[in-house]
């Protein structure tokens, strides 16, 4: 079973002297693969050491941006939706844990 990888990974594999086997996903498969990738990157963030957390969080952000673009949202539109939700329901700054 394969997984979605960053755009330059096939070239990096080729540069190491190996031949990558890959395909370009159809639109629906791409959306599903992005969702799977988001869960993968979130798990990696959770499991990362303190030193690796920034890099893993950047990976999560990259997948979120790709998902937004896939849904037709640019960063500005996504920020607007997030701001609207924050104004209606708040953020997470107060660290409230509901029992």
How would you label these PLM feature ranges?
Residues 1-99:
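Flexible "arm" and connector segments at domain edges
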């Amino acid at each position: 079973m394969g997984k979605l990888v960053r755009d330059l990974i096939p070239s990096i594999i080729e540069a190491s002297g190996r031949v990558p086997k890959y395909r370009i996903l159809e639109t629906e498969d791409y959306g599903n693969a992005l969702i799977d990738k988001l869960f993968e990157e979130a798990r990696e963030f959770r499991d990362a050491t303190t030193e690796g957390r920034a890099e893993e969080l950047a990976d999560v952000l990259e997948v979120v941006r790709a998902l937004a673009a896939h849904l037709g949202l640019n960063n500005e539109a996504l920020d607007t939706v997030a701001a609207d939700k924050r104004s209606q329901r708040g953020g997470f700054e107060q660290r409230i844990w509901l029992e």
